[in-house]
Each structure stands twice: as C-alpha cells, then as structure tokens.
UniProtKB/Swiss-Prot annotation:
Protein name: Small ribosomal subunit protein uS2
InterPro entries according to UniProt: Ribosomal_uS2, Ribosomal_uS2_bac/mit/plastid, Ribosomal_uS2_CS, Ribosomal_uS2_flav_dom_sf
Gene3D superfamilies xref list: Glucose-6-phosphate isomerase like protein, domain 1, Helix hairpin bin
Any GO BP: translation
Length: 232
C-alpha cells in the first residue's frame, strides 16, 4: 500500500508552492505548473519522494539509528514536538543554537547542567536554598529546557536530520553536511534541493501540510522500531 495518497496531499495543501518570483530554478523538476502567480508542486513526484524518505527513515530506525526533527518556524513548532515525541525521537523547535552538531560536546555540557538543575528541583535541594537563588536557578532551567529540552536525552550525534524548510534552517543543514549526516527535508519551491539527501517537494508553510508529512516520518520511525524489535 502507498505510504501517502494524492488525496491526502491535496487536502493538506502540500501542492501549493511559493510565489513564482520567489523560486529556486533547481526546483523546476518538481513543479507541475503555475497558477495565479503561485507554483503548483507535482504531487506525483511528492508521492514517490515520500516513499523514498519513508524507506530510508524506516531502515535507519530498524538499525537502531536516531533522527533529529528540526523546525523552528511557527507553522512547524507544534508538529515537530508532537511527532518527535510520538515516535520517541529528538527535536529542535525553538531556535537552532550554532554548534548544536558541530560543537556537540559544548552543547552536551549545557544539557548536563539542565539535568543537574532538574535533579536539584526533584531531590529537595531547592527547598533549602534562599528564595532568590532558587528563582535564578529556575529561570536558568526554563531557558535551557526551552532550547535544549528536545535533545536532552540525545547522548550522541543523530543518524539523520528531518528538516522543515532548509532555507530557514540553513545553519542546521550546513552543520549536518559538514559532518556527513544525511538530511531528509520538506523542500518548497524557494529552496535549494541540492543540499538535501532525501527531498520531499512540498508546502513548508501550511500547518496541515507540515503535520501530514512530519507524521509520515514519525510513522516510518515507529515501523522501523517494530522491525528492530522483531530482529532482536
């Protein structure tokens, strides 16, 4: 059975690209036509590409690999968090901190600090400290949790990235490319597909489109994990 249907893609508005004046010519192979100054993405190609990405992600999870979901634009934040948590993977949905991959050890130190503050809150340490100090520590914990909460259990670099809007997440894409980490991405008509290993041509601005495609990637992880359990 197909991973995704044309009907699902149409209903979620995955076919709506950007305005024709804001396009990347490298996306031409994925464009079906233009209508009223907006590019329409060829959904037959999207169906095929979703299947390729699904297979890659399923295999990754089946081999015990991890996927980092990245989407910091408003339309993506909720779907990224929900779907990553649903399939037990990691996510960044607030702001990509430079060096999250290329300087991972420093980031791990900040994560260790977050774990330390969480322990202090749980084991009663906060109760014996002055109120002012506790307020400062809680503020520090909230800030760390906001930016690093989605990767706080990521002990090592991820096996791959799933990115919504590689143009917006260009720092994440550059870091992954530098380290040779494969990238799966929803790529709209204004993005450069050459930087992405597994391209899903589609609308990266509509919440429903983002939710649908992100959900399929999470499904692939869950299916791959089941295979991993069977293999064991």
């Amino acid at each position: 059975m197909a991973v995704i249907s044309m009907k699902q893609l149409l209903e979620a508005g995955v076919h709506f690209g950007h305005q024709t004046r804001r396009w990347n010519p490298k996306m031409a192979p994925y464009i079906f036509t233009d209508r009223n100054g907006i590019y329409i993405i060829d959904l037959q190609k999207t169906v095929k590409k979703v299947e390729e990405c699904y297979d890659f992600v399923k295999q990754l999870a089946g081999e015990g690999g991890t996927l980092l979901f990245v989407g910091t634009k408003k339309q993506a934040q909720e779907a990224v968090k929900e779907e990553a948590e649903r399939c037990g993977m990691f996510f960044v949905n607030q702001r990509w901190l430079g060096g999250m991959l290329t300087n991972f050890q420093t980031i791990r130190n900040r994560i260790d600090r977050l774990h330390e503050l969480e322990r202090m809150e749980e084991d009663g340490t906060f109760e014996v400290l002055p109120k002012k100090e506790v307020a400062q520590l809680l503020h520090e914990k909230e800030k760390l949790d906001k930016f690093l909460g989605g990767i706080k259990n990521m002990r090592r670099l991820p096996g791959a990235l799933f990115v919504i809007d590689p143009r917006k997440e260009r720092i994440a894409v550059a870091e992954a490319r530098k380290l040779g980490i494969p990238i799966v991405a929803i790529v709209d008509t204004n993005c450069d597909p050459d930087e992405i290993d597994y391209v899903i041509p589609g609308n990266d601005d509509a919440i429903r489109a983002v939710k649908l495609l992100t959900g399929k990637i999470a499904d692939a992880i869950l299916e791959g994990k089941q295979g991993e359990q069977v293999a064991e």
